[in-house]
């Protein structure tokens, strides 16, 4: 089905059903083009109001609704909320890219319906495993960081209003990347010194964008500080632990966790248990210990009942958390029980929903 779609409703992955021309009749994009972020930006900069989209052949993409359609275990209402949030974040990102600011009401449209749904789903491990299959695009990354920040804030005892603000700061922490060259937005590997210097500016860009758009200094500070580390090794200001805002400490833990969960260039990926171990170790120096401990101690009980694959090739189920070594639980394989705290040569490779 071919539809005439307003430019504000166009999504990455949509396919043009006709050539797109600017107001002077100069061709911009050809029929059949699968729209990328840069393509949509081009159309917006030429002030096109509507384009022809072939909805019978919409391509999948990181930010499209199909990003979560392949997750059968996800409840329909939650899936719809995530789809809507991804689309809204794209609108927010594009508005920032083309206008240098974004509408405050977009952030509420992004958050309100989603947080109502995820708050009912207390098993954060299952939620993160559901989202694990999504592409590691800026949009989905920001969504995951915002969700995990919301959980951590609640575990630390923050009020519902504070949890909302911390979650919003998590969603917006990378909004400054809208001002980066497209090749750098997703953190290109092996950047040269010049590229790395430009990439690191996204923290300041984010601060400026949020202040211009929301006039919210705390949310802006989170965007500015989310790469600061407690030992002074971060950027842009090389702050130490006590100089980092409490909200930033939470978002930084969530951001680090989600970053560790991405697929590496060689196709490898760290398992959930290994990621939790790495976060735990960072809590002694770079990350603040309170949000780290909240993450570890609240996620660990959610591992009980999950199916796992061990690095010896066997599959089993976690039946008991080990309170003295949270990363080495008791696993049942058929009639046999394996205490990983004692059999330390065996490790959990992967956790399943």
Describe each model-derived feature in a short phrase:
Residues 131-134, 186-194, 223-224, 247-248, ...:
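Short alpha-helical linear motifs
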Residues 61-198, 211-213:
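Acidic/His-rich, divalent-metal-binding segments that scaffold phosphate/diphosphate chemistry
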């Amino acid at each position: 089905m071919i539809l005439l779609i307003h430019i504000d409703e166009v999504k990455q992955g949509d396919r043009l059903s006709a050539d797109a021309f600017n107001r002077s009749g100069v061709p911009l994009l050809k029929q059949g083009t699968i729209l990328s972020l840069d393509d949509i930006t081009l159309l917006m900069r030429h002030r096109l109001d509507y384009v022809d989209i072939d909805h019978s052949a919409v391509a999948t993409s990181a930010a499209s609704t199909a990003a979560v359609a392949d997750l059968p275990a996800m409840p329909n209402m939650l899936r719809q909320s995530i789809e809507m949030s991804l689309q809204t974040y794209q609108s927010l990102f594009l508005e920032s890219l083309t206008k240098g600011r974004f509408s405050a009401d977009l952030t509420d449209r992004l958050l309100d319906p989603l947080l109502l749904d995820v708050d009912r789903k207390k098993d954060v491990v299952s939620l993160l495993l559901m989202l694990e299959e999504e592409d590691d695009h800026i949009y989905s990354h920001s969504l995951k960081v915002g969700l995990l920040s919301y959980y951590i804030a609640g575990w630390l005892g923050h009020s519902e209003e504070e949890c909302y603000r911390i979650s919003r700061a998590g969603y917006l922490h990378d909004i400054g990347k809208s001002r980066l060259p497209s090749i750098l937005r997703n953190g290109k590997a092996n950047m040269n010194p010049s590229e790395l210097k430009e990439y690191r500016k996204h923290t300041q860009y984010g601060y400026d964008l949020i202040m211009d758009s929301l006039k919210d200094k705390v949310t802006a500070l989170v965007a500015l500080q989310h790469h600061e580390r407690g030992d002074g090794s971060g950027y842009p200001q090389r702050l130490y632990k006590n100089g980092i805002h409490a909200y930033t400490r939470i978002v930084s833990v969530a951001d680090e966790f989600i970053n560790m969960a991405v697929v590496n260039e060689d196709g490898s990926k760290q398992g959930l248990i290994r990621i939790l171990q790495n976060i735990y170790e960072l809590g002694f120096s770079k990350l603040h210990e309170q949000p780290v401990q909240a993450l570890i101690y609240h996620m660990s009980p959610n591992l009980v009942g999950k199916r796992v694959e061990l690095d010896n090739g066997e599959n089993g189920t976690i039946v008991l958390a080990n309170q003295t070594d949270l990363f080495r639980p008791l696993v049942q394989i058929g009639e046999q029980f394996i205490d990983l705290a004692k059999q330390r040569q065996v490790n959990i490779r992967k956790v399943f929903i």
